[in-house]
């Protein structure tokens, strides 16, 4: 329901009714921001925050993955911090290791650890300053820290801010919560160092983005399919015109389904779960065991313990137009 209210080019009647509450939200958020900035923690290690000003999935984690891979290729020593949304660790800060479950650290940290093959420290804490201090103490040779999300976590000083924008949803009706999808007013974009727009946006939206500096466009590119059970990798063309059921428990499943369709897969059914869904075997009851199941990397991490031989995830990369 909220999607129908928020993601319109212009606010509808209900959004207008909710606008007074949005003004209260903005006032509270501004006071919180000022209070946090007065006691900001400044690390000696440069910190880059990759976040957004809207709710929902915009593609932050793939951007973090891409940037960390670039730093590794330059022989740098990056580390990653995250809130660890939905995590149930015994203590914080919590370092992700090879034995860590997604339920302990959260979906995105688990996926990043797997994708980066344990090459970088990943530390989670609801208070990101704790995670930074843990890295400073335990990984003193770290020369850059990437924060997956946390743009509005002003307790932590940052050296660079990158905002990720979904080209399809953009900023919706451009109103703040609850009248619209924004966590902060759209004017906040004038303060950030870089904006990365993922997907193809309209000419009208490109005109809007001309008001902001350092806008980069990127698109999601399907790279390969990976078997969840065996980790076998195959070219995406292997699934051309093959029937498959698509599973998605992410913030914006439409993007995933579109990527599958662009890979010439014949999707016979789509099963959508809420973002950060804790998958169990019962979620797949009624699915023909002979048909191929395809899901996102983030979802696959949580299905490893009960995956079948014909379950795959689609790995992706970002094609950046610099």
UniProtKB/Swiss-Prot annotation:
Keywords: ATP-binding, Kinase, Lipid A biosynthesis, Lipid biosynthesis, Lipid metabolism, Nucleotide-binding, Transferase. GO terms for cellular component: plasma membrane. It is an enzyme of class 2 (transferase). It comes from Francisella tularensis subsp. holarctica (strain LVS). GO terms for biological process: lipid A biosynthetic process; lipopolysaccharide core region biosynthetic process. Pathway: Glycolipid biosynthesis; lipid IV(A) biosynthesis; lipid IV(A) from (3R)-3-hydroxytetradecanoyl-[acyl-carrier-protein] and UDP-N-acetyl-alpha-D-glucosamine: step 6/6. This is Tetraacyldisaccharide 4'-kinase. It comes from the Bacteria.
């Amino acid at each position: 329901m909220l999607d129908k209210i928020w993601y319109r080019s212009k606010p509808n009647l209900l959004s207008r009714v909710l606008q007074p509450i949005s003004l209260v939200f903005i006032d509270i958020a501004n006071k919180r921001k000022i209070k946090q900035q007065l006691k900001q923690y400044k690390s000696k290690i440069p910190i880059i925050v990759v976040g957004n000003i809207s709710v929902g999935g915009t593609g932050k984690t793939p951007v973090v993955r891409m940037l960390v891979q670039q730093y590794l290729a330059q022989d740098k020593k990056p580390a990653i911090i995250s809130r660890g949304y939905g995590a149930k660790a015994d203590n914080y800060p919590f370092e992700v290791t090879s034995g860590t479950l997604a339920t302990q650290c959260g979906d995105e940290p688990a996926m990043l650890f797997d994708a980066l093959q344990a090459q970088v420290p990943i530390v989670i804490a609801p208070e990101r300053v704790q995670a930074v201090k843990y890295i400073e103490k335990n990984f003193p040779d770290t020369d850059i820290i990437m924060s997956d999300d946390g743009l509005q976590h002003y307790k932590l000083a940052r050296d660079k801010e990158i905002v990720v924008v979904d080209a399809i949803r953009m900023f919706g009706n451009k109103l703040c919560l609850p009248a619209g999808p924004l966590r902060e007013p759209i004017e906040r974009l004038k303060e950030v160092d870089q904006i990365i727009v993922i997907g193809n946006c309209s000419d009208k939206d490109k005109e809007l983005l001309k008001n902001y500096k350092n806008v980069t466009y990127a698109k999601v590119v399907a790279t390969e399919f990976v078997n969840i059970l065996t980790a076998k990798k195959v070219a995406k063309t292997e699934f051309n015109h093959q029937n498959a059921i698509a599973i998605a428990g992410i913030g914006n499943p439409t993007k995933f389904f579109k990527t599958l369709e662009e890979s010439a897969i014949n999707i016979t059914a789509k099963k959508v779960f809420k973002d950060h869904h804790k998958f169990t075997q019962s979620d797949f009851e009624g699915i023909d065991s002979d048909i191929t199941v395809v899901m996102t990397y983030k979802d696959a991490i949580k299905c490893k313990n009960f995956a079948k031989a014909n379950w795959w995830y689609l790995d992706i990369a970002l094609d950046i137009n610099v």
